[in-house]
């Protein structure tokens, strides 16, 4: 018998993604991706129990080629996430690469109302705006892309420069083109696919630890994410890390 907290996959989708059961009501299980930023529901009889989550994607962690006589100031990150579990995963990732990051768990629809004050409070170099999203092919609509777009626009009212404030926005299947048009430096999802829970954090960390005086290697940074340029895309910009002397 399946229960809340079990790992499962969906038979109707060839068991392609591992989920965690968050709740069960009237024979329907409400699911969240164990690794992908995805929420779904499925009848009990469509689910196969999985014993464990096997992560085949090994995230690449940015590293510094430090010189003993210099000190380094990576860019600061404000990570806004509608999902607390994924937020904590991302904060742990930032901690593992020794980057300063503040995290806020806020529902997608509330972010446009709060983002300006959060930017004023934390004064970040990089803002991540993420959570959950979905593309309905039949209706040609998105679950939460509108809120991401409005949040980006509000942030750009405060700081228009794409180099003074780096914005990384979107979640699974988000409206990539409109997020970029709204003012994001990076966004999901060019091919309307699901993205890994850590993908926004991987890009944010790479930008944080890239030289502020040089343009980033856009393709290389995108290749560090699980699905590459199919899941995330962006514009060429400069990094946010400064180097100083003496140490």
Which positions does each model-derived feature cover?
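Intrinsically disordered, low-complexity, charged/polar segments
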Residues: 35-78
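Short, solvent-exposed secondary-structure boundary/capping segments
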Residues: 27-35
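Short beta-strand-centered aromatic/proline hotspots
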Residues: 15-26
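Internal alpha/beta domain cores that form substrate/cofactor-binding pockets in large enzymes
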Residues: 74-176, 181, 186-200, 208-211, ...
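N-terminal accessory regions of nucleic-acid-interacting proteins
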Residues: 5-8, 28, 56-57
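Short coil-to-beta transition motif at edge beta-strands of beta-rich domains
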Residues: 1-13
């Amino acid at each position: 018998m399946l229960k809340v907290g079990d790992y499962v996959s969906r038979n109707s989708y060839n068991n392609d993604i591992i989920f965690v059961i968050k709740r069960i009501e009237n024979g329907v299980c409400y699911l969240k991706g164990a690794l992908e930023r995805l929420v779904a529901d499925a009848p009990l009889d469509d689910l196969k129990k999985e014993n464990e989550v096997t992560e085949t994607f090994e995230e690449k962690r940015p590293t510094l080629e430090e010189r003993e006589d210099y000190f380094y100031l990576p860019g600061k990150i404000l990570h806004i996430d509608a999902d607390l579990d994924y937020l904590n995963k991302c904060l742990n990732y930032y901690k593992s690469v020794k980057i300063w990051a503040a995290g806020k768990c806020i529902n997608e629809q509330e972010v446009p109302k709060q983002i300006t004050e959060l930017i004023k409070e934390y004064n970040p170099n990089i803002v991540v705006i993420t959570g959950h999203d979905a593309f309905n092919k039949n209706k040609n609509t998105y679950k939460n892309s509108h809120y991401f777009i409005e949040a980006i626009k509000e942030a750009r009212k405060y700081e228009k420069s794409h180099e003074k404030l780096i914005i990384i926005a979107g979640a699974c299947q988000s409206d990539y083109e409109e997020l970029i048009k709204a003012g994001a430096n990076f966004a999901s999802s060019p091919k309307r696919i699901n993205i890994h829970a850590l993908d926004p954090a991987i890009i944010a960390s790479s930008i944080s630890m890239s030289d502020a005086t040089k343009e980033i290697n856009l393709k290389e940074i995108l290749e560090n994410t699980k699905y590459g340029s199919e899941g995330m895309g962006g514009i060429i910009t400069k990094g946010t890390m400064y180097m100083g002397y003496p140490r």
